[in-house]
């Protein structure tokens, strides 16, 4: 389903396609008209995608077709072996993880996983993990620490599942445990925010030495809709909330919440997922190279300093 701000672009694309079909069917030379429209389309695309509002970027971050964790694992990694279950209650499909190779190096990978359609989203709980998902992630953190493998995570969740069943099984406590466990890793840890980075559900697997974010992804303590419902008593004020939350990649880089922005193809990662995944792989390799050679103690201290330096402080 097209986004509202993309409709003028889609209309021009439709008109160009119609002219090409007409020229092919009738033999009439419409090359000049087509070229003019294509030039106009290029300008419109550039103007639109270079001046996106925070709310428009949130919409792009949620677009169907963006690369998921499993997409990245399939195309950027080799020999991925998925591990299931938390060895306590169940397996949570909203979080996937396991062992893989990245350019010949053994790594442990964990990430949120959304579905492509309604059926798969129901199975994956729309990427909202239960406590057993975070326990599975911690199991993999321990595995990475034990064998000295780099620990890589991919974030794409509106937040941890807030249902009664999750609360009964200790959702808040498990998120806190996961944050603590990841902060104590003695191996290189790198996080990539693929789409949505919603609150503690995202942070639970994002306490890394390097945090990267895709150009149109977002990362915040709360979703714009929820923030608007609380502050303005109306979820329709989400665009205003998105502006106030400073949740875009550019804002987060300025605030030093993230360390680098991974560029997306024009129009968003869903327009050319393969190219987006190549960019992700390149950014991951660069981040790992920066951490290469650091001792376990130095990696721990690097991560500690990174998170202690976040925020703004005013002396009384």
UniProtKB/Swiss-Prot annotation:
Gene Ontology biological-process entries: fatty acid biosynthetic process; malonyl-CoA biosynthetic process
InterPro entries from the UniProt entry: Acetyl_CoA_COase_a_su, ClpP/crotonase-like_dom_sf, COA_CT_C
Enzyme Commission code(s) on record: 2.1.3.15
Top-level lineage group: Bacteria
Molecular function via GO: acetyl-CoA carboxylase activity; ATP binding; carboxyl- or carbamoyltransferase activity
PROSITE patterns: COA_CT_CTER (PS50989)
Main subcellular location: cytoplasm
SUPFAM superfamilies: ClpP/crotonase
Pathway: Lipid metabolism; malonyl-CoA biosynthesis; malonyl-CoA from acetyl-CoA: step 1/1
Catalytic activity, as annotated: N(6)-carboxybiotinyl-L-lysyl-[protein] + acetyl-CoA = N(6)-biotinyl-L-lysyl-[protein] + malonyl-CoA
Stated family: Belongs to the AccA family.
HAMAP family per the UniProt record, alphabetical: AcetylCoA_CT_alpha
The protein, known as: Acetyl-coenzyme A carboxylase carboxyl transferase subunit alpha
Gene: accA
């Amino acid at each position: 389903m097209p986004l509202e701000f993309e409709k003028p672009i889609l209309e021009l694309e439709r008109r160009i396609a119609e002219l090409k079909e007409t020229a092919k069917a009738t033999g009439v030379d419409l090359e000049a008209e087509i070229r003019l429209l294509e030039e106009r389309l290029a300008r419109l695309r550039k103007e639109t995608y270079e001046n996106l509002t925070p709310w428009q970027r949130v919409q792009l971050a949620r677009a169907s077709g963006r690369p998921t964790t499993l997409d990245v694992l399939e195309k950027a990694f080799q020999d991925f072996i998925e591990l299931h279950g938390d060895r306590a209650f169940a397996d949570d499909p909203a979080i996937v993880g396991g062992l893989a190779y990245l350019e010949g190096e053994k790594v442990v990978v964990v990430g949120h996983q959304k579905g492509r359609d309604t059926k798969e989203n129901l199975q994956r709980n729309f990427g909202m993990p239960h406590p057993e998902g975070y326990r599975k992630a911690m199991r993999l953190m321990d595995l990475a620490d034990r064998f000295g493998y780099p620990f890589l995570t991919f974030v794409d969740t509106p937040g941890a599942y807030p249902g009664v069943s999750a609360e009964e099984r200790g959702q808040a406590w498990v998120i806190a445990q996961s944050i603590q466990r990841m902060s104590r890793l003695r191996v290189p840890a790198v996080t990539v925010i693929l789409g949505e980075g919603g609150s503690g559900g995202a942070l639970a697997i994002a306490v890394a030495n390097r945090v990267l974010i895709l150009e149109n992804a977002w990362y915040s303590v709360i979703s714009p809709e929820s923030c608007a419902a609380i502050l303005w008593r109306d979820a329709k004020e989400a665009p205003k909330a998105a502006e106030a939350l400073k949740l875009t990649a550019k804002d987060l880089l300025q605030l030093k919440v993230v360390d680098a922005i991974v560029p997306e193809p024009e129009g968003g990662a869903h327009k050319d997922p393969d190219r987006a995944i190549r960019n992700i792989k390149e950014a991951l390799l660069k981040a790992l190279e920066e951490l290469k050679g650091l001792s376990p103690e130095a990696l721990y201290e690097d991560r500690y300093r990174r998170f202690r330096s976040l925020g703004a402080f005013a002396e009384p």
